[in-house]
Amino acid sequence: AENKKKTDEKENLFPSLNFIYSLKENQNLRIAYSLTTARPSFKEASIAEIYDPLSNLFFIGNINIRPTYIDNFDIRYEAFGEKAQLLAFSAFYKNLTDPIEIGFVAASTSNYTPLNLENATVFGVELELRRSINSLFPSIRNLVLNFNGSYIISDEKYSEDEFKLRTLGLREGQTISNSRPLQGQSPYLINTGLDYNNQEKNVQIGLYFNVQGKTLEVVGDGFYPDVYTMPFNSLNFNLIKQFKGNRSLTFKITNLLNDERESRFEGFNNESQYFKLRNVGRLFSLGYAIRF
């Protein structure tokens, strides 16, 4: 017989409010509220059991997983300058209902699954800057500095079961609070870069760096330690040369620092151990394009 059951039949209304107050001709104050959702992926909202040969683990779906609903509150000050220069400062607060997290299946570190927790909060501040170097050093032309950085505090209350397991798993000298960081939420983000654009010579050059702080990847339970994603320092180079006849040459280098992507088990008074380690290496690419 045909199965006509839908996985999610709930109708949703997602209101949003935006207020913009012009402080000066080139300065704005923005205040916003919105309700958004983060729905589980097909893999998460299923009964699938998927083997990952890289980590030697099984991902087990959860057919009962619920969407996350997020109340977003934002305030932002922004000032604009010549040639698209920008200085902006923001503060934001998010309240998450039924946040989806990835945790180990009870009494096993070979299986992990998505779970809903009750509530979580996220508070953060953000600085955004786009500045022409020429305004600081007149002898340097066509060079622009871009910077975006965030500092974030997240708080997730333990479920009753998780708190009991973590309490039972306490070691001598170890204490426990009633909350922890939200799984998947980095404590800081940094994206910065230099863009050189010489229109006379039809050359664009970019050097970009981004990194995020140590992030809870898989939630443990006290007996099995939490898994954290370690910071990955990504430095990339990009060069584009335009020629006559709609032709262009592109040269890219990805991961100039040759950093590794790693995740680690971290327990109390224990040396961290690898959960996953991947040497992505440096990637060089050269391309030539003709537009018709």
Residue ranges and their predicted role:
Residues 1, 42-48, 55-56, 99-106, ...:
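Outer-membrane beta-barrel translocator domains and adjoining extracellular loop/strand segments
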Residues 19-23, 35, 67, 79, ...:
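Residue-level signature of outer-membrane beta-barrel architecture
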